[in-house]
Amino acid sequence: MSTSKLSHPTAQVLIAIILGISLGLYSRSPWGAGSFDPGTLGQVGMLLIRFLKALALPLIFFAVADAIVRTNLAEKSGLRFLLICLVNVSIASGIALTLINTLHPGTKWQGHIEELLKLVGSSSVAAHIAPEKTKLDWLQGLSGMFPQHLLEPIQTGNILATVILAALVGISVRSLSSTTDEQERRAVDLLASALTGGFLVFSRILHFAIRLAPVAILALVSQAVGKLGLGIFVDLSDYLLIVILGLTIQGLIYYPLAAFIGGGRSPLGFLRGASQAVWTGFAVNSSLATVPVTLKCLKEMNVDEQSARISVCGGTNFNNDGVVLYEVMTALFLGQAMGMALDLPQQLVIAGSSIIAAAGIAGVPEAGLVILPIVLANSGFSEAVIAAAIPLVSPIDWILARCRSAVNVLGDMLGATILSHWRRSG
């Protein structure tokens, strides 16, 4: 295999998984037992996960604020586009909730979570399920939206408060951009540039950190296999297939029907026109990197340029249905694995956290895995549970990430198609 092929992220992840499995099996073998502790490797892998978690909220803050300042949306088209995004993400959340509550893939994992909790130094699952926390206090939740100081949302990992603060900053800077005072205008331009610069800096740091993902995956896979054996992949197959099923329903059933109902296009014609962009998104694992191909396909589908740019370029922060569906299903899967009886309001809180987090992580490689610790923390999972959960999903996230990207690309194209049809219809 050539050096260029080995340097490809997919190849590196596959090699990391193979090496992780090998080390895990070696630690379980008679000649390897006691030679090293796979749990130590797992802790090394979690260092990167914690670092990604620390980067996620500042990135979300700058991404949301910068998007509000920089995105040029006409009022009517902007409201229409946001309505399309809201419907799409609600459908994605509904699909996730329906599949998880119907098929219950997490029930067979209850014993495995217990073992992994012991491996990370925690006593039992029961110690991490606090009955008093399972009851939602809406007044307390509302008060959490208003921090005591500006840095508190990022310090405490509060997604909703972070996004609200970012939105207020972005709206304020945007509203001041029309000032006629030259000195004020320079100050506003400086603030806008600072928001863009902050987003670019944290994005670059995150891209550097993502390059270490194969090392973290190797460590986490060796930890999981060393403790649970190869049976972990057999048991994970249910979770993998159900997430792929959810993404398939969203991408291949709902989107074509929505294109027919809202965009006046035949379902097969929509999928045929979008196929090149979707496969490109799957291959490169990024809806943002696929933008040129997506715009080309939309042009060939006779979607007007303004609608295409609003949905594909301006709406990057809002078209993340694949990520939202993945986050909701993963959090509920882990809840089932822990034996937690989550009622509908609690599940909706998880869905809301996923939607908010996904809005600020657009274009970031492995975005789903990056924001997963934040979503789990905001959904009431303890640090120990998060440390035990990440090794479960990381071995198969590389394939799910590509499926998520493909769905996100198709969601971008659906938004442009419907928006273009509405513009032509008046």
Spans of features found by a protein language model:
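Hydrophobic transmembrane alpha-helical segments of multi-pass transport and channel proteins
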Residues: 51, 86-90, 94, 244, ...
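Membrane-interfacial loop-to-helix junctions in multi-pass transporters
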Residues: 52-53, 157-161, 207, 246, ...
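Short amphipathic alpha-helical coupling elements at transmembrane boundaries
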Residues: 39-50, 144, 152, 190-207, ...
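Transmembrane helix boundary and interhelical junction motifs in multipass membrane proteins
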Residues: 56, 213-216, 286-294, 324-329, ...
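Small-residue-enriched core segments of transmembrane alpha-helices in multipass membrane transport
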Residues: 81-92, 237-254, 273-278, 348-361, ...
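Signature of multi-pass transmembrane helix bundles
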Residues: 3-10, 14, 21-25, 33, ...
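Helix-loop-helix junctions within the multi-pass membrane cores of secondary transporters/permeases
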Residues: 276, 280-358, 416, 426
